[in-house]
C-alpha cells in the first residue's frame, strides 16, 4: 500500500506541474499561450484561453498538487481525493477534445494518466473497505 501512495504522490505532482505551468501560461497570455493559436477555440464558448487557463491552473493544477501532498502524508481520505482529481482530469480531457474537435497524443496520454490514478484510487478504497459499495454493508 505504501508503494501506491508513493506512486500517487509522484503521479499527481507531475500532473500538477504540467497543469500549473500550462494554466499560468494561459493566464499570462490568454491570446496565444505557448504558441497555441486562438483558432482552436472556434466553435467553443471561449474567445480566449483565460477561463480554460484559470480552470486548468486551479482545479487540475492546484487540485493535483493538493492530492500529491495528501498522498505524501498517506491520508486516510487519499482514495477519495485521488479519485476526484483523476476523474476531473479525464473529464477535462474529454471536454477539451470535444471543444477543439481534435485528439492529440497529449490528450491520450493525460487521459490514460487520469485513468491510472482513478484505478489506483479505487484500489486504495477497496483495500480500506471504503469503496462506496462497501459502505452500505457495514
Labelled PLM ranges:
Residues 1-138:
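Topology signature of small-to-medium multi-pass alpha-helical membrane proteins
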Amino acid at each position: 500500500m505504501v508503494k501506491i501512495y508513493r506512486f500517487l504522490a509522484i503521479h499527481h505532482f507531475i500532473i500538477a506541474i504540467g497543469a500549473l505551468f500550462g494554466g499560468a501560461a494561459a493566464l499570462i497570455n490568454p491570446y496565444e499561450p505557448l504558441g497555441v493559436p486562438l483558432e482552436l477555440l472556434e466553435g467553443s464558448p471561449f474567445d480566449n484561453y483565460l477561463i480554460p487557463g484559470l480552470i486548468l491552473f486551479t482545479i487540475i493544477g492546484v487540485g493535483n498538487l493538493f492530492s500529491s501532498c495528501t498522498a505524501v502524508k498517506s491520508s486516510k481520505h487519499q482514495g477519495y481525493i485521488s479519485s476526484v482529481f483523476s476523474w476531473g482530469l479525464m473529464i477535462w480531457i474529454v471536454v477539451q477534445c470535444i471543444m477543439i474537435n481534435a485528439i492529440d497524443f497529449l490528450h491520450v496520454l493525460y487521459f490514460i494518466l487520469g485513468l491510472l490514478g482513478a484505478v489506483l484510487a479505487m484500489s486504495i478504497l477497496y483495500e480500506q473497505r471504503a469503496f462506496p459499495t462497501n459502505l452500505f454493508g457495514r
